[in-house]
Design a protein with these regions (language model features):
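Generic structural signal for hydrophobic core residues of well-folded globular domains
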Residues: 11-12, 27-31, 47-50, 63, ...
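Alpha-helix boundary/capping and short turn/kink residues
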Residues: 13-17, 33, 53
């Protein structure tokens, strides 16, 4: 299973500026982000402590669900 970070890199460079791109760009630029993580708890805890924008956790929850479906 690839990491959630790797899954999110598909949203980098999107022409349309949306919340998915915003989160992916932030993850890329944050050198402390747990790039090898696949665990919901590990990633959500990190985001709770280092929230990049107001609704980042909502965006994360939605994208993590899609990640699980695609990776299973």
């Amino acid at each position: 299973m690839r990491s959630f970070y790797h899954y999110m890199m598909r949203y980098r460079g999107n022409i349309q500026a949306d919340e998915e791109k915003r989160l992916a760009e932030w993850m890329f630029e944050d050198h402390s982000f747990p790039k090898q993580a696949t665990s919901y708890n590990e990633i959500s805890s990190y985001l709770e402590w280092n929230i990049p924008f107001t609704n980042a956790l909502t965006v994360f929850d939605r994208l993590y669900d899609a990640y699980q479906i695609e990776e299973d």
